[in-house]
Amino acid sequence: MSNQPAHKIKIGLITATIWNNDGSYSVDMSRSYKNDQNEWKNTSGFFHSDLLNVAKCADRAEIWISRQLATRT
């Protein structure tokens, strides 16, 4: 994997980070939150109320990756 993501998709507090490793794509999903010290942090755990945005991010990530792969052929 490169040090920089190929693309990021953000919906609300949910982020899909897309990585390109020699043409093979992977996706990390995370939720942003503020801790007790009011600092922004990320977690891979999601609440029930996050799941719709997780699904939307996953869908948009799949579309973005599919378009990238289609331009190679």
Model-flagged regions — what are they?
Residues 1-73:
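Single-stranded nucleic acid-binding surfaces, predominantly the OB-fold ssDNA-binding core
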